[in-house]
């Protein structure tokens, strides 16, 4: 695990955006260290398709969940985090060569979807579709 170079609060701060029965979508204002292991575990399913860089670490959680301008959303089922979707303004990715080549780079009008994942056992229930719908709105 990489060294942690930041102060961490244990409790996440979220705002419920949508809910239906046992399912809800929350905007993360701050991802607390109590949720890191769950987020990292969920991200492991991305490694198969996208490689080891897709797995979250405490540092990438700080970068993409707790950075001003990013748009991190989580999905919960019966209170447990089951997935997440993270949007990053394209202009914040100025160190990425491919981002600088995008026709919208510098216009401050584009959100890049950094990650979108829902745990396998919750697929087929419409939860991923609802998370995406909230994210796009």
Predicted regions and their residues:
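Short amphipathic alpha-helix that is part of the acyltransferase structural core
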Residues: 4-60, 67, 72-77, 81-82
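A short, structured loop/turn motif at beta-sheet edges
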Residues: 80, 121-122
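Residues in soluble alpha-helical coiled-coils and helical-bundle/repeat scaffolds
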Residues: 48, 122-123
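GNAT-family acyltransferases
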Residues: 41, 52, 63, 89, ...
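Conserved acetyl-CoA-binding loop-helix of GNAT-fold acetyltransferases
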Residues: 114-118, 124-137
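Conserved acyl-donor/pantetheine-binding loop and adjacent beta-alpha core of acyl/acetyltransferases
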Residues: 81-115
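Short secondary-structure capping micro-motifs at structural edges
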Residues: 60-62, 71-72, 98-103
């Amino acid at each position: 695990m990489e060294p942690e170079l930041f102060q961490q609060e244990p409790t996440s701060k979220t705002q419920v955006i949508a809910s239906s029965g046992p399912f809800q979508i929350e905007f993360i204002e701050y991802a607390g260290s109590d949720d890191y292991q769950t987020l990292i575990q969920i991200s492991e399913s991305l490694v198969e398709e996208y490689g080891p860089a897709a797995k979250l670490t405490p540092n990438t959680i700080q970068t993409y969940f707790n950075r001003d301008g990013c748009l991190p959303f989580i999905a919960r089922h019966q209170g447990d985090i089951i997935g997440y979707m993270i949007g990053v303004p394209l202009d914040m990715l100025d160190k990425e060569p491919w981002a600088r080549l995008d026709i919208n780079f510098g216009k401050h009008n584009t959100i890049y979807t950094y990650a979108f994942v829902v745990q396998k056992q919750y697929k087929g229930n419409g939860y991923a579709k609802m998370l995406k719908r909230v994210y796009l709105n």
